[in-house]
Amino acid sequence: MSHGRDIGYELQSSLLVDAASGLPVAPLAQTLTDSAGCHSTLKDDTSAPQTHMDALTTDITRLEALDIGKTLVHIIDREGDSIAYMWELSVQGLRWLIRGKEGHRVQYKGETQKLGEVADGLEFTVRAEVDYKGRKAGLAISEAPVIITRVARPKRSDKETGRRIKAQPGHSLTVRLVVAQLSDNEGRVLGRWTLLTNVEDKLCGEERAQWYYWRWSIESFFKLIKGAGHNVEAWLQHSAVLRRLLIVSMACVLAWRLQRAEGEENARARQWICRLSGRQQKRSRRESTPSLLAGLAILLNTLKLLSEYPRRTDPAGSKSPVPVRRCVDTYVRGWDAFITFL
């Protein structure tokens, strides 16, 4: 929803991803905003709707309070390029990586320049090879320190007047500019990300750019969510909305993780799960996440059905399982083996 007259709902998801491999771990939070207010898995009651960045900042603070035992780096797209929110997160000691808007101005070497102009003047070195839209691309990295001094223009309304809050003088904020550039074998530029971060300098720019590459690939996870039962208005229920959101999200995480897992055993598991879905796949392409999700749904429902089949004894009085039960045991052993692949 982009304005008050829109019809629908908004879903904001926080997904925990392994920084080393880029594989999903679990959905940490779901925040659903509809006509009744804001529902979140991070709190029990319903709250008033907030702007996108206010809601995100609130969720980030609550996620940090979970104390999961690891240092969190919050990766945010271009909407997060706001000095007000960068400063708010930084003063709390929270770490973030945000894609900057190239038209915004920063101070670099004592001069005020657009972020894109600073990126144009940097020298790049290819550090790694990554997948980009189904083909290989070189990932070149360059970085530099910049200072953000522009005024803050938060998208908030004054509670008394209802008008948008006026621009506020901002505090200067020194951050690291990391520019990631993708190019093909002939040197043609395929894409560029200008990233701003307050993560300490002891980490190399390649590692920080890789994090955003993981975030960019996560888009496929959210596309899977949109096509996997998150049509809330069709559920015809009100009591278990958030529980269903988390179940669907976890199923999407499992399918997404399996689709990206390497190794011969994982490849066989993907082929088998895809065959269960009944969907056709191109020979040269890896099995798609929608087909894997459909196959997993069939597998789990089948296992559930077979596991509930009553145990019976044969006429001779033996308590050994009948063939159907042996089939169940075979399926369960196969499922346990499949889980170990992940």
What are these model-predicted stretches?
Residues 3-10, 17-342:
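Single, function-defining residue in the core of a domain
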